[in-house]
Amino acid sequence: MSPSSIRLYLVTAIMSGALIGVAALALPAQAEPRVFELSAPDAREVFLAGEMTNWSDGKVPMRKDADGRWRATIDLDPGQWLYKFVVDGKWIADPGSSDRDADGSGGQHSILFVGPGDWQVRPDIPRGHVDTAMVPSGLRSGGVKVNVYLPPGFERGKPYPVLWLLHGGNMDADQWFRTGHVERYMDNLLAREAIRPFVIVMPSDATSSYAGGSERFISGELPGWLQQTYGLRVDRRSSGVAGMSMGGYGAFRLAYRHPDLYGFAISLSGYFSDSYIASLSKQGTLPMQAVLLCGDKDDLVITNRKLVKALKAGGADFSYREDPGAHTWHYWSLRMVEMLTAADAYFTTGRLPMARN
């Protein structure tokens, strides 16, 4: 039901400004039993479904007690898990949990974090702030939604680096914030001085696939708004882009097309069409530094392998790694620290750490 082990990747070490390496360790996962409960005395049947059950494929029947509450207990490995209840055929978020977000299909999923990690909220440390704005754009009369993470003690006009985070399909700027809780990771990493302060910009893809009008907004209009609003200057030495799923493709595409703005791209489980891969096959070197990561049980691993083959044939310099995992936030949550520390390493040294097996 859950992986028997997870890979924990040690943070890139920086000493005197020099990159000294990235290591990988295979450690046994410390699974924890978790009890899921739902009060539904009139329901005929209730299932637990989520990333831990591959959603409907392995949904777990819940048992009804005399008090009208349905319960199920399963062991979960550390990390983030999305889930829902299926009540007499209707999929619902957990009414007992306030941590939830849009699911991209008109409903909501619930969010659970298991075990100690940088996903935890620590009340004893300084916390950053997330601004939400409808940024004026020629693309939409009402503007385009953007979330901006500002580190603790942010000062307008100070030269902060900028990491752009792109969301997946059918979602918006909230996904990295309200589902991924990237702000928690940032606060914790900053508190223990594992990274230096930088800003995270989470734009909405206003069209699709980060092309056309969406590309013009993100790479054309948004940098000017960031400078006007926060005093931030965006250039390749102090800016990079990352994303998951469709956002992984968007990160690679935007950095490839706008190397003056983005010095690196990190793609998590990106989708790359055959036509896009064909367009890159004869391009040779990449204009940006790039790291591609994908789960070995992700359906999109095939497109990633095709892209890797094409890039290698063209002589491109990049890094690719497959890890245990699927197309889930559980997988991405276990990559989050690596992604953020890699961005910090680039902002500090000018080099993006290569993903090591």
Regions found by a protein language model. Name each.
Residues 1-7:
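N-terminal secretory signal peptides that target proteins for export/translocation
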Residues 26-31:
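Boundary at the C-terminal end of the N-terminal hydrophobic targeting segment
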Residues 32-59, 63-357:
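Non-catalytic cap/lid and distal C-terminal segments of serine-dependent acyl enzymes
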Residues 11-24:
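Bacterial N-terminal signal peptides
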